[in-house]
Amino acid sequence: LTRLAAHRPIRRQPLAGDPDVRSWAWNAQILFEAGEPAAANEILRRAELYPCEFMPMIQTQILAKYQDRLDADVAEKAETYVRDMLPRAASERIHPSMYNDNFGNMALYVLLVAGSRFGLPEYADLGRIRLEELCDQFRRCGTVMEYGSPTYSPINLYVLAEIANHAPDAEIREKALRCEERLWVEAVTHYHAESGRMAGPYSRAYYIDTVGHAHLAVQRGAELVAQVGEEGGLR
């Protein structure tokens, strides 16, 4: 972890009142897509990194998608952080059948994509094992623990789609697509057209989801489901 000292030290946990740097990094991706790499790099340069389940995937995505637009110091910061977080992604406590399976799926993305990118077969191979465990979860149960969740179903869909986009070989991409398709079936069967969102019962939800105010993730997922319905197919 000391390798990040030239940038910002990794804290064990954010402090109360700290900004949500996950949102900073998500916004940076939007800026890259909008053709504003200078602003995106400055956000990433200032974002303080700490151990969590979301940021390792976000930083891996940024390296996979925007490497040619990253300033050298920002790229080094991201790579160092992801390398340091790989053991966390490989922890036995993080796996496809855990209750917070969005954590397991984000770790799966990091293992597969970062492990391959950095030439670390011990992590890439573990990612393959974990992906097969996820496939087995679908074969045995038909869905994941966070089924029908207005917050986490869209996150799980997004992660699996990104594995299919950035995975190093065709077999991994095909397995990820099959898992993604099964989750789309889950989303469609919970979609309530009149309200434009997923309907209960929810496996995991927040108060905001129960009083008629959709999460941003819900809105994103509902819009995609609506498009799928109009086009008449899952893909």
Question: Whereabouts are the PLM-identified features?
Answer:
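Aromatic-lined, polymer-binding surfaces characteristic
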Residues: A16-A167
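Extended polysaccharide-engagement surfaces of secreted carbohydrate-active enzymes
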Residues: P168-R235
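Generic surface-pattern signal
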Residues: A6-P9, P87, S91-I94, D136-R139, ...
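Mature N-terminal, pre-catalytic/accessory segment of carbohydrate-active enzymes
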Residues: L1-D18
